[in-house]
């Protein structure tokens, strides 16, 4: 009995340590959702690039087996407007222990040609963000009340996201800043961060190999201004096409804190396919930090739908996959 109680106490401390800033990001957390052929997850600049109106539904569950562990559900949609612009929409719901957040983004992106013959393109993206954040105290232990928190707290945040994307043939690199406006509200909690801006950098290269196949190494970097954390994903993805332009992909992702490169947070496979107008992507991550002994890993599932195919007259918005 004492061992079980002590185990719960240790687990609670670990959760508070690892996840204390997670719920303060005021944005849907980014894990491996973007690797399911959905880079719009991490940058507004990808809105409108492609030949279809796209809708992607994602479910994400972190640290399976841990009670009240982080989870989120999100809808991502984007489509092209005329030949060189795009619009997008994100709706999400996220929970982590006693915190809840939800909201959405509305995006506009514009794409220009830097050099037609060398296939160099530049994209700009802007999103308006609306977020609600709530702290639920109904599950707090009344025998050990927190002197700073005696009732439910909630707040809303209106903010913006900006991004830039450069493409040169099969190379791409994007930079994005999320929640660029500093916070003008307070939940009156001592450890609440005053700075909300998150920075993301994403780059990769698509290598054409034999037998209608592609190999795509990529790097995704995130920096959280609230507490100075930064994490990096190292990814590799193999894509195989058939004669009908359907394809499947397999790969792997390796995530680590940048001050602990040799101690990964998580590592795991990614798989998926596109068949006609439907795509499915799945990723599994094995937790390798102090929570490893208490959970069965992290799962992410994305189901995508593509509608209203219309080829663009501008190469800067044509599909980046298998040009």
Residue ranges and their predicted role:
Residues 1-9, 114-116:
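Positively charged n-region of N-terminal signal peptides that target proteins for export
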């Amino acid at each position: 009995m004492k061992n079980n109680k002590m185990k719960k106490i240790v687990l609670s401390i670990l959760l508070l340590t690892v996840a204390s800033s997670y719920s303060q990001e005021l944005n849907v957390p980014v894990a491996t959702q973007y690797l399911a052929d959905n880079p719009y997850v991490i940058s507004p600049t990808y809105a409108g690039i492609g030949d279809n109106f796209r809708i992607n539904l994602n479910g994400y569950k972190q640290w399976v087996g841990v009670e009240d562990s982080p989870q989120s559900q999100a809808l991502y949609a984007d489509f092209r407007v005329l030949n060189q612009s795009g619009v997008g929409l994100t709706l999400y719901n996220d929970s982590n222990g006693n915190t809840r957040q939800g909201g959405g983004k509305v995006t506009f992106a514009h794409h220009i040609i830097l050099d037609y013959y060398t296939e160099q393109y530049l994209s700009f993206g802007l999103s308006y963000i609306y977020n609600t954040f709530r702290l639920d105290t109904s599950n707090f232990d009344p025998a050990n009340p927190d002197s700073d928190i005696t009732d439910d707290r909630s707040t809303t945040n209106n903010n913006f996201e900006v991004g830039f994307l450069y493409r040169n043939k099969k190379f791409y690199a994007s930079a994005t800043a999320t929640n660029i406006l500093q916070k003008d509200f307070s939940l009156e909690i001592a450890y609440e961060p005053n700075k909300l801006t998150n920075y993301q950098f994403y780059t990769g290269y698509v290598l054409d190999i034999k037998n209608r196949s592609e190999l795509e190494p990529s790097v995704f970097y995130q920096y959280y201004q609230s507490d100075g954390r930064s994490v990096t994903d190292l990814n590799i993805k193999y894509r195989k096409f058939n004669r009908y332009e359907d394809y499947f992909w397999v790969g792997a992702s390796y995530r680590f804190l940048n001050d602990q490169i040799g101690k990964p947070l998580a590592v795991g496979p990614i798989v998926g396919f596109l068949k006609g107008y439907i795509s499915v992507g799945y990723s599994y991550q094995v937790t390798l930090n102090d929570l490893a002994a208490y959970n069965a890993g992290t799962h992410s599932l994305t189901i995508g739908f593509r509608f209203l195919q219309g080829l663009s007259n501008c190469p800067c918005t044509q599909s980046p996959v298998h040009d």
